[in-house]
């Protein structure tokens, strides 16, 4: 007795997508875990409370802090090649990327997952409602802001918008 199995195109496509997901999911999860265990080095002012709150946000989202330098961040930002126009109150180095300012952990995770050809990402200034600038003192206020992807040539474009 012979049994014939016939797959429609739709069923074959669903099977292919499900198979690809099953094969790729462990690799993506391992890649994300590896990114999160990459140490983070931070430069900030010793008395800056919002920087400390941003660090807590990053740690709560799985990032490991290797070193905190309470010496300010202007010299570190310049040494790492990030223009002052992208500046904020703290600068971090995560893997090979500069992370400037109150960047959400989700944006950093995306940066590490996608690995774009870039110097890093930045949230210039100190937008209210961004991580570290979102405490009770701000009364729930949330300003719109953008996380910028900064290229090595100094140009940038919007990496992620937040409202």
Per-region residue spans from a language model:
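Thiol-based oxidoreductase modules, predominantly thioredoxin-like and allied folds used
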Residues: 65-76, 86, 94
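Stable alpha-helical elements in mature extracytoplasmic
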Residues: 47, 54, 69-72, 104-108
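Boundary at the C-terminal end of the N-terminal hydrophobic targeting segment
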Residues: 30-34
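Local sequence-structure signature of Cys/Sec-based thiol-disulfide redox active-site neighborhoods
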Residues: 36-53
